[in-house]
A protein has these predicted regions:
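Hydrophobic alpha-helical context, especially transmembrane and signal-peptide helices
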Residues: 5-10, 20, 35, 67, ...
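Intrinsic-disorder-associated, low-complexity terminal segments enriched in Asp/Asn/His/Tyr and depleted
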Residues: 11, 39-40
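C-terminal regulatory/interaction module of P-loop NTP-utilizing enzymes
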Residues: 40, 50-338
Length: 338
């Protein structure tokens, strides 16, 4: 996925979070405020570079990449050494973590596990074609504003927190601590990438007619991409980048055992891992990921099948999502263990 660099589109004048305030415009909101987050075990930043005032990580569990890997393993997520190091560096250097890889390799799951490590549920921003800043940052509740205007004296501000609908980025800034998952950024367009770049570089969020929020302790940000298109290099440069590959056959078998205890004492997990390795070597429309391996193991266990060959026909639907792939996948599964 290489190609010539492309410039970001220019934004209209205004700060991050700007945008049309809508038809109801009343000046005179409260003064700017600062959100100052108290000390907590959360480490992370959306800054473009490590902040000078960064504190050492207070939780000994996160003190080395090896300890990160151990903590993730405790949560049934097996992280390769390079991936554990990327998580550690993103925390230590207070930078966003950019995870890229094929669908189903565990990128989104890792963000959830990081949230578990930090004791929070990740706030997810699901990207899609046409997503804009209002869906990511905030919107005004125009209906409530209009109703309020009808029953209040002239001149009273309708740009107050009670009328502000916080979207994922603003919610992540306001919650303490927080993990912000920006999922499948490759599905968004250049303009939204440019908006995110402004957010990742800034220490404030400006909400016109309301106030400017100073971000003293930003959320830990995880961005994921399936590689369907090239994400702009300027955005990646603000992050710790890691390509998440498929696990080794041995690791995949262990992942299956950890997530599907019903097959832990049988040869089925190893057989499935071997079959998945073979399938990924074929020219399939949609090669199976780890998520499909786990789903197939659960289906086989539910059906009472003890080998891959026995489950080949009945459990095929949880593994294959493209009609063109069915015959090739069925042949590999029916062949069973070597």
């Amino acid at each position: 996925m290489t190609g010539p660099a492309r410039p970001f589109p220019r934004h209209s004048p205004g700060s991050v979070g700007g945008g049309p305030a809508g038809p109801l415009r009343t000046r005179g909101g409260p003064p700017a405020r600062s959100i100052s987050k108290a000390d907590h075990p959360f480490i992370g930043s959306t800054g473009v570079r490590p902040r000078a005032e960064s504190r050492p990580m207070p939780n000994a569990s996160f003190s080395t990449p090896e300890r990160i890997a151990e903590e993730l393993a405790r949560l049934n997520y097996l992280a390769a050494p390079g991936l554990a190091a990327a998580v550690f560096l993103a925390m230590k250097l207070r930078l966003p973590l950019f995870l890229e890889g094929d669908p189903g390799v565990g990128k989104t799951v890792l963000a959830r596990k990081i949230g578990e490590m930090l004791g929070v549920a990740p706030i997810r921003l699901q990207c899609h074609s046409g997503i804009d800043r209002s869906q990511a940052l905030y919107e005004w509740d125009f209906t409530r504003q209009l109703l309020h205007l009808r029953g209040t004296p002239d001149g009273e501000s309708i740009y107050r927190r009670e009328f502000l609908i916080a979207r994922p980025i603003l919610r992540a800034v306001e919650e303490r601590p927080s993990v912000l998952l920006i999922d499948e950024i490759d599905r968004a367009d250049d303009e939204f990438e440019a908006f995110l770049l402004e957010v990742l570089e800034g220490d404030t969020l400006s909400i016109p007619d309301y106030q400017t929020i100073t971000i003293d302790e930003p959320p830990f940000v995880v961005l994921t991409s399936n590689g369907t298109r090239e994400v702009h290099g300027a955005l990646k440069r603000r992050c710790v980048y890691h390509w998440v590959d498929h696990p080794t056959e041995q690791d995949e078998a262990e992942i299956i055992r950890r997530n599907v205890p019903e097959v832990a004492g049988t040869p089925l997990a190893a057989q499935i891992a071997t079959a998945m390795t073979r399938l990924r070597q074929l020219s399939l429309v949609r090669p199976p990921g780890v998520a499909e391996s786990i789903a197939f193991a659960r289906a086989a266990a539910a059906l009472g099948r003890h080998t891959v060959a026995e489950a080949a026909d009945d459990a095929l639907g949880v593994l294959v999502k493209q009609r063109e792939d069915q015959e090739a996948v069925r042949d590999v599964l029916r062949a069973g263990a070597p």
